Amino acid sequence: MYTEVQRVKVIIEYVDWYRMQAPRLGGVKLHVLLTGELGHEFVGGRDSFIELLRRHHLMLPKKKARHTTDSNHVYFKYPNLTAGLMAQYPNHVWYADITYIWIEGDVLYLHLITDGYSHAVLGWCLSESLEAENTAKALEMAIRMAGGGNLCGTIHHSDRGVQYACQLYVSQLRENHIRISMTECYNPTDNAVAERMNGILKDEWIYHQAMFRNYEEAVFEIGAMIDFYNNVRPHMSIGNKKPMDVYQGERPGKNLWKKDR
């Protein structure tokens, strides 16, 4: 039989290990992970677990987010097909966005495509420029993940940036029978899934780490982050299930995410 001191020591060691993989993994998600590994009797309820983190100075400070886009171009801007729409199955709606990543002496651009049903990252590309060919690489990865071919049931939603509206990108969507949807104003909530994905990667990982030294290090670390996010980190919007499990067929749970958490 273990003592309370031993129980707390084990819990803190597990928290430290998970925080090494995801430096800003929050208390609620840690509770889900540790309960799955150690059992509810050992870990205790969520509130007592959060209090344990607080006592041992393991709670995380809140971070502020940032964002960018350029829609001053001559290409056709498609209407928003996602207003009021909830994704009903994997590959129903894909949300695309580009965010910047600082490295020593430079900036890189992370192109992402997230599945709206499972919240899994299906495609990504880290590049040294905002050229559309880099954005298209993330799309190619997502199409491969979805099995390729005819994706006529899929809606691709993005902001109105030139990378998403240009002929190179639009033709790739049309070749795979993917419907095109774009935001109609500059409200971040019009592409909330993508904005939330950016925030998770930055707030839970990137902002907490030392600045990446170069492109190669950034690619390696971000690849590891996305793998952890997809396959290990519980996601509150799908009932604390793992995004890739839900993408591959597991039924999502109730949305547990609230802004005040």
Where are these regions (language model features)?
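Basic, flexible linker segments flanking DNA-binding modules
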Residues: M1-P90, K242-R251
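RNase H-like two-metal-ion nuclease catalytic core shared by retroviral integrases
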Residues: K9, T69-H73, S158-R160, C166-V170, ...
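Mobile genetic element proteins and their domesticated derivatives, centered on retroelements
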Residues: V10, V15, L30, F49, ...
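Short amphipathic alpha-helical interaction patches enriched in hydrophobic/aromatic residues
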Residues: V15-R19, L34, L38, C125, ...
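Mobile-element integrase/transposase regions
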Residues: D47-L112, A136-M141, M145-A146, L151-G153, ...
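A short acidic/small-residue loop/turn micro-motif
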Residues: D115-G116, L126-E131
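Short small-residue beta-strand/loop micro-motif enriched in glycine and branched aliphatics
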Residues: A120-W124, S181-T183, Y207-Q209
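C-terminal domain-tail junction helix/linker
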Residues: R174-I178, I200-R261
